[in-house]
Amino acid sequence: SVVKYQKKKYKIEDFALESIWQNDLKYEEYEKLNNFFWFFSLDLKSSKRTTQTVIDNWINKNHRYNKKSWDFDITSKRIISWLSNHQLTYEDCEEKFKKKFDQSIQKQTNHLLYEIKNLSEVENKIVGCAAIILTGLSYKEENKYLANGLTLLKKIIKSSIDNQGFPQSRNIKQLIF
């Protein structure tokens, strides 16, 4: 599943935030840190300002394309996490941060739109479509994201499901998502 439910909630203040982006991590840990899915484990009573500072620091460090941190799957999940946790990431933020956040989301979504055609894994394409569609729903004035995301999702469904509604692939990874 895209998001795993956890009962235990953490306060963002419990993490070592000053050194969070400077650690030399194994790829799996790096992926978990940079896709921000750990935000789903945060208590909604966590500091919004601290959460926004973590994002601001990430944007400052990764505003230019970097193959590792802009990996398609990582970027898709990061967009989903940032937008789904808007109570912590976006509410009550300063105008300067809001503008920077919006630009980063749009830049990352444009990257997904450009890269999705190069992917072969159906699961990653669907997660990418979810991120693009979520961006379109979150930024209604940018209706190109919603329209493009839905068009891509239709193409994925047409190419992976036959006329009777059965999966065309026998690949077990593509049958379970």
Task: Describe every region a protein language model picked out.
Residues 1-37:
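N-terminal transition regions in large eukaryotic proteins
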Residues 27-177:
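Aromatic-lined, polymer-binding surfaces characteristic
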